[in-house]
Amino acid sequence: HSGQKKKLNFNINNFSEFKKKIIYLVLENEPDDLIYQKRGNSLFEAATHRRINSVKRIAYQRNKLIDGLNEAGDEDFVFYSDNDEMPNFINFDFEANKNKIVMFKQKLFYYKFNLFFDRIEWYGTKACKKKYLRSFNWLRDVKSKKYPNYRLDTIFSRKKYTDVKIIEEGGWHFSQIKTPKDIQTKLLNGEQHAEFKKAGKNLEHISDLVKRKIVDYDHKAKSKDYKYSKEFKLKSITIDNMPVFLKDNLNKYSEWFDFEK
């Protein structure tokens, strides 16, 4: 999202069991409407435009996913989810659902699989049938709320809807389950990279946050407000409400858990 070229790390042969189910899309170009300034005979990206260009890149990348749905039928459900979000389908009835849009209310975790961030409810995975899908960026931007039928503004809005099903206990969002070094690399290249760079967070600072089980990013701050001004403590929880895969592989991934001693 920062515009830096990245090598292709995905090797489909590492997932031979699911090879027939994977459609691997590679984006070769950038959107045409990025904002650059001219300096002599060359173009450069001004600091004031980095954020908006980053948003344009990620939206362009999201919408590329539509190319992977050529074989999907109009009645098939399409799910949009970040790769660190794991939807829980136990409480979702595919056959009985009549709602236009489905949202999964998920628990948010940081650094370790069981370090729970209880300050916000995370509406991660969203879904609709293919016949309703305008674009993946549209689905992602739909407001995480079921609006009452008397809200007339929903008739004209592309983000506010009344025909919404919210799935309680809808899964898990595992954010920054990485080493401090990898967290730094991700944040320097992610959607919020300009703000992260402005905050001046170095590797030592990130390592300290992980050690103290602290999140210093304010998810509730307004979009234009500075978001690195507060600290929030994570809670260590038991394995009871974790995904079955993690329960069954607790020893294998023990370094990515942090239980209270």
Each model region followed by its residue ranges:
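Active-site-proximal specificity loops/subdomain of glycosyltransferases
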Residues: 2-80, 89
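Conserved catalytic core of nucleotide-sugar-dependent glycosyltransferases
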Residues: 54-55, 85-201
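C-terminal accessory extensions appended to soluble enzyme cores
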Residues: 162-261
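Compositionally biased, low-structure terminal segments
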Residues: 11, 16-19, 93, 137, ...
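Serine/threonine-rich low-complexity intrinsically disordered regions
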Residues: 11-16, 31, 42, 93, ...
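Long amphipathic alpha-helical scaffold regions
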Residues: 1-2, 112
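Sequence-level detector for tyrosine residue identity
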Residues: 24, 36, 60, 80, ...
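Generic alpha-helical propensity signal that fires on short helical segments
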Residues: 4-10, 36, 40-45, 120-122, ...
